[in-house]
Swiss-Prot record:
This is Large ribosomal subunit protein bL35. Residues 20-42 are annotated as: Disordered. Belongs to the bacterial ribosomal protein bL35 family. One of its GO terms (biological process) is translation. It comes from Syntrophus aciditrophicus (strain SB).
Length: 65
């Protein structure tokens, strides 16, 4: 069986936590920031845990991370 290749785009966007959960960054934080409140922009800077429904597919893309 051949080696599995890591999806490089996914590897740059997602990280695994110590407990095996997938960490991701928030969307909507790159431009058109003037209409967003300071509180909203501050919260968008933080990372969050990926939803369980999406976890299986992402873990398949990044098998060795």
């Amino acid at each position: 069986m051949p080696k599995l290749k890591t999806h490089r785009g996914a590897a740059k966007r997602f990280k695994l936590t110590g407990s095996g959960k997938v960490r991701r960054h928030h969307a909507n934080a790159s431009h058109i920031m003037t209409t967003k409140t300071t509180k909203r922009k501050r919260n968008l800077r933080k990372s969050t845990i990926l939803d369980k429904r999406d976890e299986k597919g992402i873990k398949r893309l990044i098998p060795y991370l």
